[in-house]
């Protein structure tokens, strides 16, 4: 059976030594995250669990989840993103943002994704980085697909760069091991970029990890994927944004790793003229009692690039596509802030959460405080962009939901302190 050996005080070399002493086989080590993966029998696993400073956890499966839709795709996703970017001169495109998409691979030859992918690596048990299952291509499109052009099918930040780290195999299944090795690779790239003196805006400097995948929340704070996500955020300054899951409206259904306090969990609202939580969007609290998700954003009936050929598009729904929408929004916020305050200005959702009640909106009948359906609410994009860049974003020519995205609230200037 496959296990993860997690450091609780031991060095990576010490863990590997203990594993070899126990007779472990198929050893594979991370570079930075102090975890080792290996094959153990029950007796070997029990012996290693007695070693001080070491945790032994069986490897678990993770899956992507998406819902096919028979409805005509909603046009406003690309339209409102274009409108929002166009209120700035020159228009925002999310340039400078690099999102590591840990998923089922990406069809980088698709017309909407050409020249977007700057790095590829395969940690799944499938033979190539190609998207055979059909999920990662859609996620990448929502982040950075297309061009900033009127009528163009495009994602939120078409100027952003994408890293394709395949951690889900061609049947739609991944594991603790594949996901953690992917996270470790992203941290290694960030550390290498830092050592080279690269600006965080360099395309080889990953800023966000997008995890549109998950497994059942087991309540285990020491779960190896949760450990890896926390390290990526705390030690390497990378926002980890994850899909809440599609198993609502039941309570306590937010997936792992979205359930972790250090991970930004994203639920989905209907892509309509009303702010309504999508029925299948997973709800909190987590098994440990955390209020989740953190935010909600569009996630239903979205038209995205297909993995099947280079000109095809497909309409799907799911929190899998809400998460990359928030990842893409990072690029617009960060770019607008850099214009106002200089290249050294940074934006992280992890730190912005303390201001979330001031830049998010909910239906009138929803709780004012963070709740287990909407979280803090829907980020009002225009509000946030206006505040970080001191540009007034008009709202008169958009629908009710667009106004919710773009309305100005009372928090002017508070995000200037988010660094």
Question: What are the residue ranges of the model-derived segments?
Answer:
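C-terminal subdomain of the subtilisin-like protease fold in secreted/lumenal serine endopeptidases
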Residues: 196-211, 335-418
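Short glycine-/aliphatic-rich beta-strand segments at the starts of folded cytosolic domains
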Residues: 1-8
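Hydrolase catalytic cores
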Residues: 142-143, 163, 167-169, 253, ...
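N-terminal domain-start motif of subtilase-like serine proteases
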Residues: 28, 41-44, 65-101, 121-132, ...
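Extracellular S/T/G-rich loop segment that most often corresponds to the catalytic His/Ser-adjacent loop
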Residues: 103, 111, 255-338, 383
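Substrate-binding/access-modulating region of protease and related hydrolase catalytic domains
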Residues: 167-262, 289-290, 309-323, 370, ...
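Autoinhibitory propeptides
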Residues: 9-79, 87
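Subtilisin-like serine protease catalytic core
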Residues: 88-119, 127-178, 202-207, 235, ...
